[in-house]
Structure formats: C-alpha cells, structure tokens
Amino acid sequence: MVSLTINGQKVEVEPEATILQAAEKLGVFIPTFCYSPQLTLVGACRMCVVEVEGMRALVASCCTPVRDGMVVHTDTERVHTARKINLNLLLANHPLDCLTCEKNGNCRLQDYCYLYGVSESDFKGDRKDYALEDTNPFFIRDMNKCILCGLCVRTCHEINGAGAIEIMNRGFDSKVSAAFYDPLENSPCVFCGMCVDACPVGALTPKQSIGKGRSYELETVKTVCPYCGTGCGLELYVKNNEVVRVKGDPSNPVSRGQVCVKGHFGTDFLKSPERLTTPLIRKNGELVESSWDEALDLVAEKLKGVKGTELAGFSSARATNEENYLFQKLLRSLGTNNIDHCARL
Amino acid sequence: MTNSIGEIEDAGALLVIGSNTTETHPVIGYRMKMAKRKGAALIVVDPRRVDLAEHADLFLQLRPGTNEALLNGLIHVIIEEGLADEEFVRERTEGFAEMAAAVKKYTPGYVEEITGVAADDIRRAARLYAKAESAAIFYTMGITQHSSGTNNVLAVANLAMVSGNVGKRSAGVNPLRGQNNVQGACDMGALPNVVTGYQRVDHRDTQSKFKKDWGVKLPVAPGLTATEIIDGILDGGIKVLYVMGENPALSDANLNHVLEALAKVEFLVVQDIFLTETAAQADVVLPAAAFAEKHGTFTNTERRVQLVRQAVNPPGEARADWVILQELASRLGLGWSYGGPEEVFQEIARLTPSYAGISYKRLEEEGGLQWPCPDAEHPGTPYLHANQFAGGKGHFTPVEYQPPAEEPDAEYPLLLTTGRNLFHYHTGTMTRRSSAIGPFKPEEMAQISKEDAEKLGIEEGDLVKISSRRGEVKVKVQVTEIVPPGVVFMTFHFHEAAVNLLTNSKVDPVAKIPEYKVCAVKLEKAVP
Ligand code: SF4
Ligand code: SF4
Ligand code: SF4
C-alpha cells in the first residue's frame, strides 16, 4: 500500500491506483468529463487537474499514478482557475438552450459551470452548425452540443465492440460520427444506446423521453430486463405512473450498466393501447368484456369440472418465479402434473 | 450455465456453437468480444455466418444438423493428439473408454464429409480449445432444437470433460437460456416430472414433503410435456387448457397442428398482457400485469436470482399473475393467503434446497444470488461442479451422428433453419408494440444466398412463397452472404410470415424438443 495526503487528509491505496481513485476513496470530489472506470484512460478533458506539491504543472488526476508521500490539493485557486478556463472554452461554442434541453438538471457541463460560477464564455468562438441527426427511431444526435469527451466512442469500441463511431477530423472540426459521416443506420451500430447513457451532456437524447419530464422529477426503480436470459439490470425512470426513460443499471452485478436495444428502447409496450385491460369471455363466438368475478367464477367452475388428468397448463418463462411456483402449485393441487412451458421451444 | 457471465471475459478460449450470441444475448456477446480483445481464442461454429463469426479466430460453417459429428471430431483430435486432460478424466469421470471407442471413426476427414468443415479447421479448433488454460463452451437452441438435441448436449459435455474444462472459473458448459425467466420457470417446477429445484414428483420424499406443506396430495405419475399436451387435446384426453403468458399459436413447431388443438380443446383460458394469437382462440382471457407492474424475482441464465420491482400500476383492471392465481385458488377452496410475492418466495425457499438460503432481504442487500445457495450464510455459487459433479463422477456417454429427421430432396431442395434477430424477441408480442423497434424492423425478410437467388431468378425484396410438407408462407427475401447456398433462414417474430407453419414437430426422444432448426422446403417467386 502507498500512503498520500489529499487536502490534508491521509489515505492508503494500492500502488497502481491513480490520484483520482485515491480521492474517490476519501470521498473528495474531482470533476471529470472523459473519465469512466470501465474505459481506457485518455486524460483529454483536463477537468480533473489537481496540484501536486513539488510538481510545477497541474496534473490530470485520472491518469497520474500515486506515489508514496505525495501531497495533493484538489481545490486551490490555481486548480479552480484552470477548470474555469476549461469550461469557458467549452461554452464558447456550446448552444445555451438549457431551457429546452432534455439534459437540463443532469448535465455535467451545467453542473460544473454552476459549481465554478461560469455563466457565459469570455471567448468569442465560432459556433458549430451541424444538422440534427434524427433519422433513427431510438435517439437524436446533436453534435453541436458535443464536448468531444470521447466516452461514447470508447463505450462503443470497448464495451459493445461494435466500433460504429469515431472522432473524425481534428481541432474545431472534430466530430463524432460513423464512417463516411453516414447515419448510424448505415453503420455497424446496433442501437444499444450505451453511448447515450455515457454522454455527460445533451448531445445524445433518447426520443422516447423527449418532453416527458426533467431528470429531477423522475423516480428511479431498479429492476431486471424482461427480454433475454442474460438478466441485465435496468433503471426505470418514472413520472406520473409512466416509465419515461430506461437506462442500464451500473450497480447490477451481471450487466454493470450494459444493455442492448431491447432492454434500452423496447419496454414501451407497457403503455401500448393494445394492452388487455379487462377480462374477456367468449359469448356467441365473440370475446366480450366481463367482470373479474364472472370470469374467475367461470374458470374455477371449468377447472373443477374435469378430472385432473383432463387438465393441462402452460406456465410462463416471462412470469416471475413466484408466479410460476403458484401456477404449478395450483395445477398440482387440482391433481395434474400436465404442466410445461416453452423451455423446450 | 455452469459458469457466470462475469467469468467470460477472462476465459482463455471460447467455443460458441449454435448460438448467434450477439443478437440473441447481446450483453453476453459484448463480453465474448471483450474476452477476444483480451487475448482469448474465439471459435464460432454455426451454419450461418453470424455476426460473432466476424470476430472469430476460427469460424466453422457446418451443415445444419451435423453438430454431433463435429463435436465427435473435435474429441477425436483431442484424444489422438494427446491433448486430453488425463488427470481430470481419471479422477473425476467414468465411461471414457466407451466414449473414446465411439469417436474413433470420427476422423477429421470423415467429419469433413458430414459437416462440410475442412479437416484442417477441425484440427485447429480442437487444439485452440484444448490447449487453453480455461475454455468455456456456449450454446443455445442451435444445439437443442434438433431431433437429436439430447445427443448434442451429451457430446458437448464429453468435449468439456475430455479436456478438463469443467468446474473451474471461466471453464465450463454454458447453455444460454432464451427467455428472461426460463431458468426460473424450470427451477420452480413448471415441468411435468419435477416440482421446485428439480425434485422428482414421483419420489416418496418429495411427495411427503409437499403433502405436509401444501396440505394436498401431489399426483404421482409425471405429466405430459408441451408437445404431448397438444397431441393429448387432439386425442380427446385433455379437455381444459390453462395458458399463462405463452403464445403457442405462433411459437410451436408445425403450427397447423397446434391451431387445430387450440380450436378443439373444450375450454381454453389464456392469461396475458396482449390479445396474442393464442388468446384470440380462448374462451376466457384474463388481463395480466407486465414485468414493471409487479414485484417478484427472475432467475437468469447464470442461475442468479434477482429482484424485479414494480415501477407503475397495471393498466385498467389488469392484475399480476400471482393475484389472479390466488383468486382462483380461493374459489377452488385451496385457502391460499399470501400477503405478497415475498411470502410466496419464503415458501419456495422452505421447499427447495438450492434456494433455501435466498431471501428478499439478501437479494436487496447483495444484488442477486446464484443457486445453489443452501443456507443463509452461503454466498451462492458462481460456477458449478468445482470439486465433484452433482451425481459424483462425470459420465461420458458415447454419441453417434444421426442425420436430421427431414433432409432436402428433389421436391423440397432447400434446408430451412430458424432463429431470432437482434431487434425482435420471440413472437414479437412485446417488441413489435415498441414505438421505436416496431417501425425500425417492421417485417420478416427470409435470408437466402446469392447463388440460390440467381438460380431461382429472385432479387432482394422479392416476395416468395416458401413451402414445406406441412404448410406455406409468403415472405420477402434478403439476399445475403450470411447463409450458405442451399440454406434458408427465417425468424419466428412475425405472425404474417409464421415460419412455424413450415417447421417439423418431430421431437427429440428424450427432451421432447421439436426440430426447429432443420426442415426441407422449396422456394418460388410469389405474386403479391
Ligand atoms: S448505440 Fe451502441 S452501437 Fe450504436 S453508436 Fe452507440 S454505443 Fe455504438
Ligand atoms: S457525444 Fe457526448 S459522449 Fe460523445 S464525445 Fe460528445 S459529449 Fe462525449
Ligand atoms: S438488455 Fe438485452 S442482453 Fe440484457 S437482458 Fe435485456 S435483452 Fe438481454
């Protein structure tokens, strides 16, 4: 173990840890844009700079390894000034339409500007003028808002493996895009939307959530994806009894925040107008609405009316364990083992 | 799965056979690609050039329905080249000699004749797999949905045991379960021969334990499987069918047969969230709550039990399945009084040794637990068979190659195989009603090769009629290099082009799984 001091507090960490990790262990906050513990380090955004005693320049804490006896300051005047200049530069060509931006309230650029009191840019930069990319049904790409942190690109290459997007060009003309500036539909993109979850600003917006609520109005419920047997953790964001957004759950031990298109964008069947909302009974050849009592009485009568061996049931690989358990308990209690589900199918 | 999903990225070699993982289990697919980037050898075996094949060190494109021959060929090479794990075979297994004798004739040359895979590639695959520090096999329906599915699974086990690749981190045999809770449905005894935790219903101990707890006597004789239930209806033996959240009218092989049964059964109850093709045939339809509208647990493919939490209320008068079942039980005088899913789970844990140590409280605190978890202190089991197999020794079973039940002939010259795609799921009940996915992939496109397209004078987007001995469908075609000449691929997501009108309901004699993966068809241009 290596021992160092951050803002006057002592901390011990593994020798291969970075200053950022040591600070995290102490609960000391350091802002970042381009850092993610699951991705390769690039040290590009310079938001995480800190002062280390005995070193002349500020260092990027995300990719500077700790040394024994190191003395670190994360909140000095110098550090703040550097971060402010950074934000200032980013704001120089960032649209300030926070009023209608879906990311408002959950945007790291907004949060850090608030924290360091940066309200507008002192630099007069050229504005970017990219057309909105909204041809796919899953999410909108507004590259005018992109701060080029590269999280989406690394997520696509290192987590998904699709490798659909790159940072094209250099300098002011840098832009995240699929090859040949093609729309994502014509690229290897599989619309997992993990880039959307990774983006710290409002450059990538899921279409299903637009206008459905501010992040701070939403309640989060952690649950499990209803599709395949991988069992990825999902975070459902709820407002007024409606799921308005879905993200991968980073705390889930199976999926660690990863998802595919079905889990991410495929659960709004919940609010389909075709959902069944009342029991139906066949009368004169037609299915007609009925009360629960009438339907359940009829089913109970029919279940009672046959010998156990004349009864069979298909249980569900979609339903919960508890429901499958009760289904087989019910049928077995009625004297039949004729129970199966589509495991074989 | 004998391993955990989290172990995939550290494997030395991955053998993926009959699984289009990046489309059917995408997040597991990400992990396989991660493993490959970290240096694992990736071997993909499939009749189609699936997406994962593009990332593979070695892609073996075998003829559909020839898995056992290929697996036997790999074992043959491993034994012949001295790559077998002799210590593992000696200490942990039995029946090696018989199995070794059976694979003797499966030389790479002979296997090439059957499978169409070059003998050299078979040798290379065997070496990559057997020489890795830890090697894991993954398969899905491409292995099981055959009339010889049970043999395929046994051959996979033989391969893993001969190379000592079981019972270790990142090494094992991993069937990837299709639906979110298919593992749980099996664990819960939604099967004709076992109650929870695979306790045989006809065993005396099971009988007395459940009788004491439930207060009713369990029927002793094992019941009918899904395919037998359909036949039972047609024979007149089964009069009432209760379907909870399944859609056999689209998912079952030889659909016409199933539709006939659903029409014939005296009373059909269907409990579901949509008016599915099956529900439309019902006498009573009960509206159910969907996953985000109730509490409970799912068990994933790595045996991990996880909490499912309610986020919103069910629409209208729809109710959770467990509520409906309890209502029925009380009308039938069974006197259930569960206060909620947690109480049901406590009963499951009480009656099921592999779930005994699991509770909602632990799931909440520990983020899921993998069975077997026999007591409250047990941390769960990330990989199975660590020190010994469930039954003591691992048993080798000799397996012979058996051709598919139906092969292409002069009248039906093409081979049809079925599966899923990335965007849709199963019978499409949920994904087709998603506002984004539905319109993005609105229709089925049957895949055929360039060669066959040219021969038949068909172009991309043309409407064709595909027929088998059992039925016909009209569908548009996609001309692609994914399928080899002679093979047609369709998914079963779309009722407008219900591929199961064509498939063969010939089942594996043991597992009773129909042969979805191979049947003979012909294809001709259709008038719209
Ligand atoms: S949606 Fe997924 S595949 Fe597509 S660009 Fe984003 S991360 Fe890559
Ligand atoms: S789109 Fe978002 S995640 Fe991607 S580089 Fe731009 S700001 Fe970063
Ligand atoms: S998010 Fe995708 S991979 Fe994960 S469980 Fe759902 S369907 Fe499967």
Put a short name on every predicted segment.
Chain A
Residues 5, 51, 237-238:
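A general beta-strand register signal
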Residues 46-191, 196-223, 242:
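Fe-S ferredoxin-like electron-transfer domains
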Residues 10, 164, 233-235:
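Short, surface-exposed charged micro-motifs
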Residues 95, 212-345:
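Catalytic alpha/large subunits of respiratory electron-transfer oxidoreductases
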Residues 8-68, 77-82:
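N-terminal cofactor/phosphate-binding cores enriched in small/glycine residues
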Residues 34, 62, 72, 165, ...:
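Short clusters of hydrophobic/aromatic residues that line enzyme substrate/ligand-binding pockets
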Residues 1-9:
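Eukaryote-biased recognition of intrinsically disordered, low-complexity regulatory segments
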Residues 35-38, 142-145, 180-185, 311-320:
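Conserved short loop/turn motifs at secondary-structure junctions
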